[in-house]
């Protein structure tokens, strides 16, 4: 009787562990729904005090004094890889299949669609920044010449490397 009871308890705990493991593993990665902000109550408007009429004064020209600290002129910013990628660079790991197939590292012809769909809504500069970030972080898992790899990936997705852009 005791062995039957302990077997039931063991089965109960095993099923609980399996249940909790499965529920924890099914995280959909969905963004949580936005929380509604409470509507603030209207604040009472202050009553404006009557303004006195200004008395006109004679205008006396004053000599112009040069500013002691002139504002330095900043040079125009050239596009570089200093921007931030608006998408998660780890998601660009799907571009590894595209890049490796183009370089004949892998047999078969994987679709470029998953990679290109990630950068589809981005302008060329943002797409270049994202792919540059992924290549520099070696998210793709391939050690390659970064500028050439960047150019190859952008060309596959019908994008162009912005002029003056350097992935350093």
Curated annotation (Swiss-Prot):
2 X 58 AA tandem repeats B of P-S-V-P-S: annotated segments: 58-67
Highest taxon listed in the record's lineage: Eukaryota
Segments of skewed composition (Pro residues): 39-78
Predominant location category: secreted
Signal sequence annotation: 1-25
Spans annotated as Disordered: 32-81
A- repeats: 34-41, 42-49, 50-57
Designated name of the protein: Lipid transfer protein EARLI 1
Organism this protein belongs to: Arabidopsis thaliana
Gene: EARLI1
């Amino acid at each position: 009787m005791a062995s039957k009871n302990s077997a039931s308890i063991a089965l109960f705990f095993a099923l609980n562990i399996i249940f909790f493991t499965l529920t924890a593993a099914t995280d959909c990665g969905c963004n949580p729904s936005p929380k509604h902000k409470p509507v603030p109550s209207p604040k009472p408007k202050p009553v404006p005090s009557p303004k006195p009429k200004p008395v006109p004064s004679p205008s006396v020209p004053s000599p112009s004094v040069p500013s002691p600290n002139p504002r330095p002129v900043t040079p125009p910013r050239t596009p570089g890889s200093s921007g931030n990628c608006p998408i998660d660079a780890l998601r660009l790991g799907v571009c590894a299949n595209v890049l490796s197939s183009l370089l004949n590292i892998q047999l078969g012809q994987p679709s470029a669609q998953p990679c290109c769909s990630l950068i589809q809504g981005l302008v060329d500069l943002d797409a270049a920044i994202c792919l540059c970030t992924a290549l520099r972080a070696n998210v793709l898992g391939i050690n390659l010449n970064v500028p050439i790899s960047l150019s190859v990936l952008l060309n596959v997705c019908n994008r162009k490397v912005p002029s003056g852009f350097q992935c350093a």
